[in-house]
């Protein structure tokens, strides 16, 4: 049948499926009335929809059109506090034929899918928006675009619900209708969809036959020709429902919440762990105050694992204005928290999507034929600042403007977003909206807005947040979102048991940068803005490194396939299996229960030692001890991504960067912690014969050592140096040097690799370290990094430096000789059998230390296994909320590993701490996995652009770990022409202030990427 005659207007009650909501026996439903389902009243006079300004149809500008169309009204301006909600404009998208476009519809979904492959390579597919399902017709108006025959009887025809798929290519600005292989889902509307990698997961909804089954349908878009799959899920699940929400949390958990099961609105929470097979739904009972039973809300997940549920309509058909955050504790508990800030309006049947830390909310209905309009039709919840903004200002009280029944006129930009039952998705900094319903008229327009604040979370925003939340009611989180885990605070206060003590960063941030790094993981998407060229250069350089190692990785994988390498039962994140279906490699959450690590012995000292960066003046050489909780930037790793054009990296020059080089002569010439100056002449002071002698002596020592060194405390641990010999000398000067006049007689030295490349003085660095190894072979220890490989350091500066400073013939010979020595370097070090030190990480393949011990040396990267690749190349995931294995943004085939892998490894090997290097971190050190892993980086201002601090770890006999830091030096006052080390353009992101800002007080909120002991949600 075409209509459900039982559905009649009933004041403000939405009985869209009366036989379902009313508890009567279900029967097929085929339409909804706008008064009931959509709460719409008649369209504007004449039945027309305001015509948006035309866009440039020129295909040549299609890639920039979406950003340009919003840029006209959003000129750069001085921002004091959070930016207001952006303005939307119409995109004039192209299509080859009419049916390629989705046409008018509502109740559909729009899902952003990241790019596949590398741009410029065969098979590359750019970022896309995938539109599925929805209702395409209204009762009394089959076309859905004109004036209905009667405003009161115009309803949504569920007989017109579809299961078609349309794809919008963001780069080409073009719609295409897809015809995937496989069995599609049944036609439906009011369903949910979310992306899992390059797959779109569909669930629930309602169609011509009533409620859709609870099956999970997956549209795999990895290949050129998409394919539908049905996911087999065991046990009971959410059951059939519509008007619910679903999101992927922490890149792992599919969360389904609320909706209507045909009888009543719901408030239940279901989770499906995509890493655990067989798949099964688990009903959660989160702690804290959660949302009431409701439907037509929105849910969007932030990249760090926070799910935000916003708005909706409760069991009494009352629209909601509240927002709730849901996050997972490290012990497996889930908890709700009410989001701070004042929402500008209640709403339901709206759309919401995160762009970094900002939740963009658009449109929505209020009931009684009213829709959200005026400046509140578009709103932003800035989760970094803890405030709501509409298109005009920060919201301090609910808006009380008019909510007329579809009144025409007014601001055209506001009119564009005055709609409900539409869908939204984000690609980079761009927010797209498609379709929906306004005044009984189905819409078919594609809107776009640019979030100019995507990379901004300013100091002023933090102050605005604090001011806005001064009078927050009980149960709300004041100021910035932050959920403090009291158990970890107690742990910090009871450190006498010897546990690893974790603190929260609070110290003067480098560069005065107060913003929380909440960049999304999927850096592959275009439009992601970075605040400086330096970070872009580091991203490009890291991608080039991955490109350089790709052949080696492919060879290692080939050996694995041929049976030469046996891997444990794990896979590589979302890599494709032979069947073409992406798999997941995260560990079951209940396995964490068996991963307990006895917190005895090792602990992180509650204070770190910091040296002022100034070389003179009142602060010159001043040493301070700061609380370990005072490092604002500890959670900020220099992000990696895949830039649009990653080419072979060139040598980076920085007049601050240096490195070392044979025994007593080398030590006498180079070990000058306070007096070393970069040589005026670049000619290296050793000849190739002397370097050969040094390498021969050191190589004999390395060959006699085990692959995993067995060391004792006390010991100093150094991270990446990358040819920055000046930083090595500064660390020796401030915290003791390896000489008889220094502290070598009572403390050992351990270096974690990456001695060469990037900096100007790789020869000095490696020469001095080798000389120290020969002179103090039982006290100075070196292990291998990923740059101690010929195929890498041929591209990133070391080979060029050898030729430049020793001539082509001798330079190439020396480069080959030192790389042969690198093949003998040990690969890890165990300290007191409680700490394991390595360069990269444990990746996907390393479960036991014995796997590392069994690697035979000498070994080249080309001949190495996946174990060697993981050991030298893998990284931790973005933060503690991202568990299991994920693809590594450094490049294809490389992985990141989550805190569950760290805990499992420590438990398997009776270890308490992993110390690794490999990644630039802003404070020189960074904690992960509740403090069971520390990333260490000793070179400051990495690549001349990162402006990061450098650090070492000092482990005492009492097994207390003390971080000791140095900050980047300010640029030299001498001119580039007269300076021995020529000034290079864009060396610094910005100059450091002559006087650093005052140290913030203890106890300030942690940033959202905290790797310490508390759970910072927002």
From Swiss-Prot:
- Swiss-Prot/TrEMBL keywords: Cell membrane, Cytoplasm, Hydrolase, Kelch repeat, Manganese, Membrane, Metal-binding, Nucleus, Phosphoprotein, Protein phosphatase, Repeat
Q: What is its EC number?
A: 3.1.3.16
| Repeat positions for Kelch | 149-195, 253-301, 306-356, 362-409, 430-479
- Where along this sequence does the record place binding of Mn(2+) 2? 754, 786, 839, 918
Q: What is this protein for, i.e. what is its function?
A: Phosphatase involved in elongation process, probably by acting as a regulator of brassinolide signaling.
Q: Which family does it belong to?
A: Belongs to the PPP phosphatase family. BSU subfamily.
**What is this protein's name?**
Serine/threonine-protein phosphatase BSL2
Q: Which gene encodes it?
A: BSL2
